[in-house]
From Swiss-Prot:
The keyword Nuclease applies. This is DNA double-strand break repair protein Mre11. Keywords: DNA damage, DNA repair, Endonuclease, Exonuclease, Hydrolase, Manganese, Metal-binding, Nuclease. The lineage of its organism: Archaea, Methanobacteriati, Methanobacteriota, Thermococci, Thermococcales. One of its GO terms (biological process) is DNA double-strand break processing. The gene is mre11. Mn(2+) 1 binds at D8, H10, D49, H208. It comes from Pyrococcus horikoshii (strain ATCC 700860 / DSM 12428 / JCM 9974 / NBRC 100139 / OT-3).
Length: 413
Protein backbone atom coordinates (compact mmCIF):
# COMPACT_ATOMS: atom_id res chain seq x y z
CA UNK A 1 0.00 0.00 0.00
CA UNK A 2 1.24 3.45 -0.91
CA UNK A 3 -0.20 6.81 0.11
CA UNK A 4 0.77 10.48 0.27
CA UNK A 5 0.74 12.54 3.46
CA UNK A 6 0.36 16.32 3.03
CA UNK A 7 -0.56 19.07 5.48
CA UNK A 8 -0.80 22.84 5.84
CA UNK A 9 -1.43 23.73 2.21
CA UNK A 10 -2.93 27.14 3.16
CA UNK A 11 -4.66 27.87 -0.14
CA UNK A 12 -5.63 31.53 -0.48
CA UNK A 13 -2.87 32.92 1.72
CA UNK A 14 -1.86 36.32 0.31
CA UNK A 15 1.27 36.40 2.43
CA UNK A 16 2.50 39.92 3.25
CA UNK A 17 -0.55 41.20 1.29
CA UNK A 18 0.91 39.84 -1.94
CA UNK A 19 -1.57 38.06 -4.28
CA UNK A 20 1.50 36.54 -5.95
CA UNK A 21 2.10 34.44 -2.83
CA UNK A 22 -1.42 32.97 -2.97
CA UNK A 23 -0.64 31.86 -6.53
CA UNK A 24 2.61 30.28 -5.36
CA UNK A 25 0.82 28.37 -2.58
CA UNK A 26 -1.63 27.03 -5.19
CA UNK A 27 1.12 26.13 -7.69
CA UNK A 28 3.06 24.23 -5.03
CA UNK A 29 -0.07 22.25 -4.14
CA UNK A 30 -0.51 21.47 -7.83
CA UNK A 31 3.08 20.19 -8.02
CA UNK A 32 2.47 17.97 -4.99
CA UNK A 33 -0.70 16.46 -6.50
CA UNK A 34 1.04 15.83 -9.82
CA UNK A 35 3.88 14.09 -7.96
CA UNK A 36 1.30 11.93 -6.17
CA UNK A 37 -0.12 10.85 -9.54
CA UNK A 38 3.37 10.14 -10.86
CA UNK A 39 4.12 8.03 -7.76
CA UNK A 40 0.89 6.05 -8.33
CA UNK A 41 -0.30 6.46 -4.75
CA UNK A 42 -3.44 4.63 -3.65
CA UNK A 43 -4.81 7.62 -1.72
CA UNK A 44 -3.86 11.04 -0.33
CA UNK A 45 -4.17 12.35 3.24
CA UNK A 46 -4.39 16.10 3.92
CA UNK A 47 -3.82 16.56 7.67
CA UNK A 48 -5.53 19.93 8.09
CA UNK A 49 -5.38 23.52 6.82
CA UNK A 50 -6.06 22.89 3.16
CA UNK A 51 -7.26 26.51 3.27
CA UNK A 52 -5.74 29.45 5.10
CA UNK A 53 -9.18 30.59 6.24
CA UNK A 54 -12.50 29.04 7.20
CA UNK A 55 -14.05 31.58 4.80
CA UNK A 56 -11.95 31.33 1.65
CA UNK A 57 -12.73 33.66 -1.24
CA UNK A 58 -14.76 32.36 -4.22
CA UNK A 59 -11.55 32.51 -6.26
CA UNK A 60 -9.71 30.33 -3.73
CA UNK A 61 -12.56 27.78 -3.70
CA UNK A 62 -12.52 27.74 -7.50
CA UNK A 63 -8.76 27.07 -7.42
CA UNK A 64 -9.22 24.20 -4.95
CA UNK A 65 -11.94 22.63 -7.11
CA UNK A 66 -9.70 22.83 -10.17
CA UNK A 67 -6.65 21.35 -8.42
CA UNK A 68 -8.53 18.53 -6.70
CA UNK A 69 -9.68 17.36 -10.13
CA UNK A 70 -6.11 16.06 -10.56
CA UNK A 71 -6.42 13.16 -8.09
CA UNK A 72 -10.11 12.65 -8.92
CA UNK A 73 -9.38 12.14 -12.63
CA UNK A 74 -6.76 9.57 -11.65
CA UNK A 75 -9.10 7.69 -9.27
CA UNK A 76 -7.09 8.67 -6.18
CA UNK A 77 -9.32 9.37 -3.15
CA UNK A 78 -8.34 12.28 -0.88
CA UNK A 79 -9.05 12.07 2.87
CA UNK A 80 -8.95 15.34 4.82
CA UNK A 81 -9.53 16.88 8.23
CA UNK A 82 -10.07 20.52 9.18
CA UNK A 83 -7.16 22.42 10.74
CA UNK A 84 -7.22 25.44 13.05
CA UNK A 85 -7.31 27.77 10.03
CA UNK A 86 -10.14 26.19 8.03
CA UNK A 87 -12.36 24.66 10.71
CA UNK A 88 -15.70 26.17 11.65
CA UNK A 89 -17.03 26.45 15.20
CA UNK A 90 -20.33 24.88 14.18
CA UNK A 91 -21.90 23.53 11.02
CA UNK A 92 -20.25 22.41 7.78
CA UNK A 93 -16.99 23.86 6.52
CA UNK A 94 -15.77 24.47 2.98
CA UNK A 95 -14.30 20.95 3.10
CA UNK A 96 -17.83 19.54 3.23
CA UNK A 97 -18.65 21.50 0.07
CA UNK A 98 -15.70 19.83 -1.65
CA UNK A 99 -16.95 16.49 -0.34
CA UNK A 100 -20.40 17.12 -1.86
CA UNK A 101 -18.62 17.76 -5.16
CA UNK A 102 -16.93 14.36 -4.88
CA UNK A 103 -13.43 15.85 -4.57
CA UNK A 104 -12.44 14.66 -1.10
CA UNK A 105 -13.69 12.77 1.97
CA UNK A 106 -13.94 14.50 5.36
CA UNK A 107 -13.17 12.29 8.36
CA UNK A 108 -13.89 13.06 12.01
CA UNK A 109 -16.79 13.62 14.41
CA UNK A 110 -19.94 14.64 12.55
CA UNK A 111 -23.63 15.15 13.23
CA UNK A 112 -24.72 12.90 10.37
CA UNK A 113 -23.93 9.33 9.44
CA UNK A 114 -22.01 8.88 6.17
CA UNK A 115 -21.64 5.60 4.28
CA UNK A 116 -20.09 5.28 0.83
CA UNK A 117 -17.22 3.61 -1.00
CA UNK A 118 -14.57 5.41 1.07
CA UNK A 119 -16.36 6.40 4.30
CA UNK A 120 -18.03 4.50 7.12
CA UNK A 121 -19.51 5.69 10.41
CA UNK A 122 -19.58 4.56 14.03
CA UNK A 123 -21.94 5.96 16.65
CA UNK A 124 -20.10 7.83 19.45
CA UNK A 125 -22.49 9.41 21.97
CA UNK A 126 -24.39 12.18 20.16
CA UNK A 127 -22.00 12.10 17.20
CA UNK A 128 -20.91 9.88 14.37
CA UNK A 129 -17.22 9.10 14.05
CA UNK A 130 -16.76 9.12 10.27
CA UNK A 131 -13.76 7.03 9.20
CA UNK A 132 -12.01 6.64 5.89
CA UNK A 133 -11.78 3.18 4.34
CA UNK A 134 -9.37 1.90 1.71
CA UNK A 135 -9.26 -1.87 1.13
CA UNK A 136 -8.69 -3.36 4.61
CA UNK A 137 -7.28 -0.15 6.08
CA UNK A 138 -9.20 2.40 8.15
CA UNK A 139 -8.26 6.10 8.33
CA UNK A 140 -9.30 7.72 11.61
CA UNK A 141 -9.02 11.36 12.61
CA UNK A 142 -10.72 14.56 13.71
CA UNK A 143 -10.43 18.29 13.19
CA UNK A 144 -8.19 20.59 15.23
CA UNK A 145 -9.25 21.03 18.86
CA UNK A 146 -7.93 23.50 21.45
CA UNK A 147 -5.86 22.82 24.57
CA UNK A 148 -8.93 23.53 26.70
CA UNK A 149 -10.92 20.88 24.81
CA UNK A 150 -8.25 18.22 25.33
CA UNK A 151 -7.93 19.15 28.99
CA UNK A 152 -11.62 18.40 29.44
CA UNK A 153 -11.93 15.49 26.97
CA UNK A 154 -8.62 13.60 26.89
CA UNK A 155 -10.18 10.34 28.10
CA UNK A 156 -12.99 10.69 25.56
CA UNK A 157 -10.38 11.28 22.83
CA UNK A 158 -8.44 8.16 23.79
CA UNK A 159 -11.64 6.17 24.15
CA UNK A 160 -13.03 6.78 20.66
CA UNK A 161 -9.77 6.12 18.82
CA UNK A 162 -9.14 2.42 19.43
CA UNK A 163 -8.23 0.63 16.21
CA UNK A 164 -9.48 -2.94 15.92
CA UNK A 165 -7.75 -3.46 12.58
CA UNK A 166 -4.97 -1.82 10.54
CA UNK A 167 -5.48 1.93 10.79
CA UNK A 168 -3.92 5.39 10.40
CA UNK A 169 -4.64 8.30 12.77
CA UNK A 170 -4.84 11.81 11.25
CA UNK A 171 -4.63 14.85 13.55
CA UNK A 172 -3.92 18.57 13.26
CA UNK A 173 -2.39 19.25 16.66
CA UNK A 174 0.85 20.33 18.30
CA UNK A 175 2.68 17.56 20.18
CA UNK A 176 4.66 19.18 23.00
CA UNK A 177 7.60 16.75 22.84
CA UNK A 178 8.03 17.73 19.18
CA UNK A 179 7.18 21.45 19.15
CA UNK A 180 9.76 22.12 21.87
CA UNK A 181 12.43 20.81 19.49
CA UNK A 182 11.14 22.18 16.20
CA UNK A 183 9.14 25.34 16.89
CA UNK A 184 9.35 26.41 20.58
CA UNK A 185 6.89 29.28 20.02
CA UNK A 186 4.16 26.87 18.81
CA UNK A 187 1.28 26.03 21.09
CA UNK A 188 0.92 22.33 21.85
CA UNK A 189 -2.30 20.62 22.88
CA UNK A 190 -0.97 17.11 23.51
CA UNK A 191 2.00 15.13 24.75
CA UNK A 192 3.28 12.23 22.67
CA UNK A 193 2.08 9.84 25.37
CA UNK A 194 -1.48 11.24 24.97
CA UNK A 195 -1.77 9.71 21.50
CA UNK A 196 -3.99 6.61 21.34
CA UNK A 197 -1.92 3.49 20.79
CA UNK A 198 -2.30 0.82 18.14
CA UNK A 199 -2.06 2.81 14.90
CA UNK A 200 0.36 1.88 12.13
CA UNK A 201 1.04 5.50 11.18
CA UNK A 202 0.30 8.88 12.77
CA UNK A 203 -0.30 11.48 10.02
CA UNK A 204 0.00 14.88 11.67
CA UNK A 205 -0.36 18.49 10.61
CA UNK A 206 -0.10 21.95 12.23
CA UNK A 207 3.69 22.21 12.74
CA UNK A 208 5.13 23.86 9.64
CA UNK A 209 8.55 22.19 9.75
CA UNK A 210 8.87 18.53 8.86
CA UNK A 211 9.67 16.10 11.66
CA UNK A 212 9.74 12.34 12.12
CA UNK A 213 9.77 10.27 15.27
CA UNK A 214 8.21 7.02 16.51
CA UNK A 215 5.51 6.12 18.99
CA UNK A 216 6.22 2.54 19.85
CA UNK A 217 7.06 1.01 16.48
CA UNK A 218 4.85 3.39 14.49
CA UNK A 219 6.01 6.52 12.63
CA UNK A 220 4.75 9.88 13.90
CA UNK A 221 5.21 12.37 11.06
CA UNK A 222 4.76 16.08 10.41
CA UNK A 223 5.35 16.84 6.70
CA UNK A 224 5.45 20.59 7.42
CA UNK A 225 3.72 23.21 5.29
CA UNK A 226 4.11 22.97 1.52
CA UNK A 227 5.23 26.61 1.35
CA UNK A 228 7.15 28.77 3.82
CA UNK A 229 4.44 30.36 5.97
CA UNK A 230 6.59 32.86 7.90
CA UNK A 231 10.22 33.78 8.51
CA UNK A 232 10.46 31.32 11.40
CA UNK A 233 10.37 28.67 8.67
CA UNK A 234 13.44 29.97 6.85
CA UNK A 235 15.50 28.30 4.15
CA UNK A 236 18.59 29.90 5.62
CA UNK A 237 19.36 32.01 8.68
CA UNK A 238 22.45 34.23 8.81
CA UNK A 239 23.61 35.11 12.34
CA UNK A 240 26.20 37.87 12.73
CA UNK A 241 28.92 37.09 15.29
CA UNK A 242 30.69 40.42 15.09
CA UNK A 243 33.13 39.33 12.39
CA UNK A 244 31.26 37.15 9.92
CA UNK A 245 27.98 35.29 9.46
CA UNK A 246 27.23 31.86 10.85
CA UNK A 247 24.80 30.07 8.55
CA UNK A 248 21.92 27.92 9.81
CA UNK A 249 20.13 25.78 7.25
CA UNK A 250 16.35 25.56 7.63
CA UNK A 251 14.01 22.72 6.70
CA UNK A 252 13.13 21.52 3.22
CA UNK A 253 9.55 21.83 1.99
CA UNK A 254 7.43 19.06 0.56
CA UNK A 255 5.40 16.05 1.67
CA UNK A 256 5.71 12.32 2.37
CA UNK A 257 5.14 9.25 0.27
CA UNK A 258 4.44 6.38 2.65
CA UNK A 259 4.92 2.85 1.35
CA UNK A 260 4.13 -0.09 3.64
CA UNK A 261 3.99 2.50 6.45
CA UNK A 262 7.57 3.64 5.87
CA UNK A 263 7.73 7.41 5.15
CA UNK A 264 9.93 8.94 2.43
CA UNK A 265 10.19 12.70 2.10
CA UNK A 266 9.60 14.26 -1.32
CA UNK A 267 11.19 17.68 -1.69
CA UNK A 268 9.50 20.55 -3.55
CA UNK A 269 11.56 23.58 -4.50
CA UNK A 270 9.88 26.74 -3.18
CA UNK A 271 10.84 30.38 -2.77
CA UNK A 272 13.72 30.97 -0.34
CA UNK A 273 13.11 32.85 2.89
CA UNK A 274 16.33 34.32 4.32
CA UNK A 275 16.43 35.47 7.94
CA UNK A 276 19.34 37.79 8.76
CA UNK A 277 20.02 38.30 12.48
CA UNK A 278 22.32 41.16 13.44
CA UNK A 279 23.11 42.32 16.96
CA UNK A 280 25.44 45.29 17.24
CA UNK A 281 26.58 47.99 19.63
CA UNK A 282 27.11 50.67 17.01
CA UNK A 283 25.68 51.94 13.74
CA UNK A 284 29.02 51.28 12.09
CA UNK A 285 29.02 47.59 13.08
CA UNK A 286 25.45 47.06 11.87
CA UNK A 287 26.18 48.71 8.52
CA UNK A 288 29.23 46.47 8.13
CA UNK A 289 27.10 43.38 8.85
CA UNK A 290 24.33 44.36 6.40
CA UNK A 291 26.85 44.83 3.58
CA UNK A 292 28.52 41.50 4.43
CA UNK A 293 25.16 39.73 4.08
CA UNK A 294 24.54 40.79 0.47
CA UNK A 295 26.44 37.93 -1.27
CA UNK A 296 24.30 35.41 0.69
CA UNK A 297 20.94 36.77 -0.52
CA UNK A 298 19.47 35.35 -3.78
CA UNK A 299 17.68 37.83 -6.06
CA UNK A 300 14.25 36.13 -5.90
CA UNK A 301 14.25 35.52 -2.14
CA UNK A 302 12.13 37.01 0.62
CA UNK A 303 14.40 38.55 3.27
CA UNK A 304 13.95 39.70 6.85
CA UNK A 305 16.58 41.71 8.67
CA UNK A 306 16.26 41.25 12.42
CA UNK A 307 18.38 44.03 13.91
CA UNK A 308 19.02 44.47 17.63
CA UNK A 309 20.81 47.63 18.65
CA UNK A 310 21.62 49.84 21.61
CA UNK A 311 20.45 53.02 19.90
CA UNK A 312 18.10 53.37 16.88
CA UNK A 313 19.11 54.98 13.60
CA UNK A 314 17.63 55.28 10.11
CA UNK A 315 17.59 51.98 8.18
CA UNK A 316 15.89 53.04 4.94
CA UNK A 317 19.24 52.74 3.14
CA UNK A 318 19.04 48.94 3.56
CA UNK A 319 16.14 48.86 1.07
CA UNK A 320 18.33 50.57 -1.52
CA UNK A 321 21.22 48.09 -1.40
CA UNK A 322 19.45 44.74 -0.81
CA UNK A 323 18.43 43.19 -4.11
CA UNK A 324 15.58 40.85 -3.07
CA UNK A 325 12.00 40.13 -4.16
CA UNK A 326 10.66 41.21 -0.77
CA UNK A 327 12.36 42.89 2.19
CA UNK A 328 11.20 43.32 5.76
CA UNK A 329 13.20 45.10 8.47
CA UNK A 330 12.51 44.41 12.12
CA UNK A 331 14.37 46.36 14.80
CA UNK A 332 14.50 46.10 18.57
CA UNK A 333 16.41 47.67 21.42
CA UNK A 334 18.68 45.23 23.26
CA UNK A 335 16.87 44.76 26.56
CA UNK A 336 17.01 41.10 27.51
CA UNK A 337 18.13 41.97 31.02
CA UNK A 338 17.08 44.68 33.45
CA UNK A 339 18.93 46.01 36.46
CA UNK A 340 17.32 45.69 39.87
CA UNK A 341 19.18 47.02 42.91
CA UNK A 342 22.41 46.78 40.96
CA UNK A 343 21.82 43.13 40.04
CA UNK A 344 21.15 41.77 36.56
CA UNK A 345 17.71 40.18 36.26
CA UNK A 346 16.39 38.06 33.38
CA UNK A 347 13.13 39.70 32.26
CA UNK A 348 11.67 36.27 31.38
CA UNK A 349 11.69 35.34 35.06
CA UNK A 350 8.73 37.68 35.62
CA UNK A 351 6.47 35.64 33.33
CA UNK A 352 5.17 32.10 33.10
CA UNK A 353 6.12 29.99 30.08
CA UNK A 354 2.66 30.56 28.52
CA UNK A 355 2.79 34.32 29.14
CA UNK A 356 6.22 34.61 27.53
CA UNK A 357 5.01 32.64 24.49
CA UNK A 358 2.16 35.12 24.05
CA UNK A 359 4.54 38.08 24.41
CA UNK A 360 6.93 36.51 21.90
CA UNK A 361 4.19 35.85 19.34
CA UNK A 362 2.47 39.21 19.84
CA UNK A 363 5.73 41.10 19.24
CA UNK A 364 6.48 39.17 16.05
CA UNK A 365 6.42 40.76 12.61
CA UNK A 366 3.84 38.14 11.63
CA UNK A 367 1.55 38.94 14.59
CA UNK A 368 -1.66 38.59 12.52
CA UNK A 369 -0.60 35.09 11.46
CA UNK A 370 -0.27 34.02 15.09
CA UNK A 371 -3.64 35.28 16.39
CA UNK A 372 -5.15 31.76 16.37
CA UNK A 373 -2.18 30.40 18.36
CA UNK A 374 -2.35 33.26 20.88
CA UNK A 375 -6.08 32.65 21.42
CA UNK A 376 -5.44 28.91 21.91
CA UNK A 377 -2.66 29.56 24.44
CA UNK A 378 -4.77 32.06 26.37
CA UNK A 379 -7.90 29.88 26.36
CA UNK A 380 -5.91 26.95 27.73
CA UNK A 381 -4.19 29.20 30.28
CA UNK A 382 -7.50 30.68 31.50
CA UNK A 383 -8.93 27.18 31.90
CA UNK A 384 -5.88 26.15 33.94
CA UNK A 385 -6.12 29.26 36.15
CA UNK A 386 -9.81 28.60 36.76
CA UNK A 387 -9.09 24.99 37.74
CA UNK A 388 -6.26 26.01 40.07
CA UNK A 389 -8.52 28.55 41.83
CA UNK A 390 -11.13 25.83 42.42
CA UNK A 391 -8.46 23.44 43.73
CA UNK A 392 -7.13 26.19 46.02
CA UNK A 393 -10.60 26.71 47.52
CA UNK A 394 -10.97 22.97 48.08
CA UNK A 395 -7.56 22.75 49.82
CA UNK A 396 -8.57 25.43 52.37
CA UNK A 397 -11.04 23.04 54.02
CA UNK A 398 -9.44 20.32 56.11
CA UNK A 399 -11.19 17.29 57.48
CA UNK A 400 -12.19 17.59 61.19
CA UNK A 401 -9.84 15.92 63.66
CA UNK A 402 -12.86 14.08 64.98
CA UNK A 403 -15.10 13.37 61.96
CA UNK A 404 -18.07 12.88 64.30
CA UNK A 405 -17.80 16.37 65.83
CA UNK A 406 -18.96 18.49 62.87
CA UNK A 407 -19.92 21.48 65.11
CA UNK A 408 -16.45 21.73 66.60
CA UNK A 409 -14.94 21.61 63.11
CA UNK A 410 -17.16 24.47 61.92
CA UNK A 411 -16.13 26.52 64.99
CA UNK A 412 -12.49 25.86 64.12
CA UNK A 413 -11.93 23.47 67.00
Amino acid sequence: MKFAHLADVHLGYEQFNKPQRAEEFANTFKKALEMCVKESVDFIIIAGDLFNSSRPSPGTIKTAIKLLQIPKENNIPVFAIEGNHDRTQRGPSVLHLLEDLGLLYVIGLRQERVENEYLTSERVGNYWLVKGVYDNLEIHGMKYMSSAWFEANLNFFKGIFRPDEDAILVLHQGIRDITEKVFPSYSAELKLSDLPRGYLYYALGHVHKRFETNYGDSPVVYPGSLERWDFGDYAKRLVWNGVTFREEVGSDKGFYIVEDFTPRFVNIKVRDFIDVVIKGDSEREIKKAVKASLPHIPRNSYVRFNIKWRKPFDVEWIKEIVNAEYLRIHTAIIKDEKSMNGESVDIKSFFTEQEWKVIDLASSDEFESYIEKIVDILSGYEKKEEREKKESKIRKFERPKNPGDLTAWLRGG
